Regions:
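Non-catalytic DNA-recognition/assembly elements of restriction-modification systems
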Residues: 1-44, 55, 171, 175-180, ...
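Glycine-anchored helix-breaking recognition loops at helix->coil/strand junctions
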Residues: 8, 104-107, 115-124, 140-197
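Low-complexity, Lys/Gly-biased intrinsically disordered segments
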Residues: 27-72, 85-90, 153
């Protein structure tokens, strides 16, 4: 798991370095965030209705879910919602590849939807325009999350509104550069998602085996490590 996390960190540095090279931070602003994607909020079904929540339904993400993981990709949080729960509120289903951005409590958690998901009202997420792509939006938010957070800092309860999020200024990327970055970033994002999945599977296996090893239910005292080493050599 440690090796996978280190590799993922290296890939993240590589991705952001390429972004910084193609899209310099000192470029003149030529548009706003709503020019490159659709800003989407979220909502919460009534907590008083147990039938609105389930363990295997529509992925529904809260800022707390992002605070509990270091993963870049997310498809499910602590709670899923049912079709009935989804229909009961104004939450919107975000397509795979949307970029989630927490807009309060706190401002600035970022993740990529690994599948279609909904969120609570603590997000102002971005559905990228096809010609812009997920990678550009993700990297832009990573590099500008503090600037965006400052926009909501003047309120009594720090929050970035939908209007604020839409108005975030940026340099509209040239199509040729967007295509180049998307071509470069695509394999990196796929590898990062695969590494995160592998880490979760290894963690689940560890958590399942460790209690059995500690209790003696599984006995490894008679395992011949010399034979194991000869197979690995």
């Amino acid at each position: 798991m440690a090796v996978g996390s280190l590799l993922n960190g290296y890939l993240e540095e590589l991705l952001l370095a390429k972004y910084d090279k193609l899209f310099p931070v000192n470029a003149d602003f030529t548009g706003i965030l709503s020019d490159v994607g659709t800003i989407v909020g979220g909502a919460t079904p009534s907590k008083k209705r147990s039938e609105y929540y389930c363990s295997n339904g529509i992925g529904w993400i809260t800022p707390r879910d992002l605070s509990n993981t270091s993963d870049k990709f997310i498809a499910h949080g602590t709670d899923d919602i049912t079709d009935e729960g989804y229909a009961s509120c104004s939450a919107k289903l975000l397509p795979k590849g949307s970029v989630l951005f927490s807009s309060r409590a706190p401002i600035g958690y970022i993740a990529i939807a690994a599948d279609a998901v909904a969120t609570n009202q603590g997000f102002k997420s971005i559905v990228p325009k096809e010609e812009i792509g997920t990678a550009f939006i993700y990297c832009f938010l990573v590099r500008n999350k503090h600037r965006i957070a400052d926009m909501g800092a003047g309120t009594t309860f720090p929050e970035v509104s939908g209007k604020m999020m839409k108005s975030v200024e940026l340099a509209i990327p040239e199509q040729t550069l967007c295509a180049e970055f998307d071509f470069f970033a695509g394999p990196i994002l796929k590898q990062q998602e695969a590494l995160e999945r592998e880490n979760r599977e290894l963690a689940a296996l560890r958590d399942a085996l460790l209690p059995k090893l500690m209790s003696g239910e599984i006995d490894v005292s008679k395992v011949d490590l010399t034979q194991l080493n000869s197979h690995l050599a």
